[in-house]
Design a protein with these regions (language model features):
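Small-residue-enriched transmembrane helix starts and helix-helix packing motifs
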Residues: 1-15, 91-92, 96-113
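Juxtamembrane transmembrane-helix termini in multi-pass membrane transport proteins
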Residues: 4-54
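Generic transmembrane alpha-helix signature in multi-pass membrane proteins
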Residues: 13, 22-28, 110-115, 123-132
Length: 189
């Protein structure tokens, strides 16, 4: 595996944060049947895949049409990543099963697909990792394939959310989320 592929894999794993989305998934879908949770997980991954592949395909074109160069986007993205990282590291630990927030509409779309799986950090990452002026089409296709792998792993984490949460425990899930936050902070600078 080349250095770029390894870097892209780690970056995608960190910004998508498959383990970190498990507590949220339990909070919003934990009351559903196993079949409904699989359906919600599948929809969330499908929607996230479409969003991220649209940005792989036309994200750079849209930025250029808006007059935003990738260097500026990289700086802005780094700042966004830093803010997200700080939130991940400094958030209060809580039991996601005790979260009684109201759920409106399709939870696969919001909050799962957007903003948690295909959020600002993921979108920024895929646009930068598939820069048409820097990377060959082959490298961009490899990065897209890595995205599919990470989203597949995320689907597995969502479908096995109860197991993952039992394995890690609430404390472990919170620790994993904070470690991901520190990694995101390191990527941001």
């Amino acid at each position: 595996m080349s250095d770029k592929l390894f870097h892209d894999l780690v970056t995608l794993f960190v910004v998508v944060n498959p383990i970190g989305v498990v507590p949220l998934f339990i909070a919003v879908a934990g009351h559903e049947s196993a079949a409904a949770r699989r359906r919600i997980a599948g929809q969330a991954i499908l929607i996230s895949t479409v969003i991220l592949f649209v940005f792989i395909g036309i994200g750079q074109i849209v930025l250029e049409a808006l007059g935003i160069n990738l260097a500026s986007f990289r700086i802005a993205g780094g700042l966004v990543l830093l803010i997200i990282a700080l939130r991940m590291v400094l958030q209060e630990a809580h039991d996601p099963r005790a979260d009684s927030s109201a759920i409106y509409g399709n939870i696969a779309v919001f909050p799962l697909a957007m903003p948690f799986i295909a959020g600002p950090a993921s979108i920024m990452a895929v646009v930068l990792m598939t820069d048409n002026n820097v990377y060959s089409v082959r490298q961009e296709v490899e990065t897209a394939a890595l995205l599919v792998v990470v989203l597949g792993f995320t689907y597995g984490c969502l479908v096995g959310a109860d197991f993952v949460l039992r394995l890690l425990g609430l404390t472990g899930a919170n620790v994993a989320s904070r470690i991901m936050g520190l990694t995101v902070a390191a990527l941001a600078v």
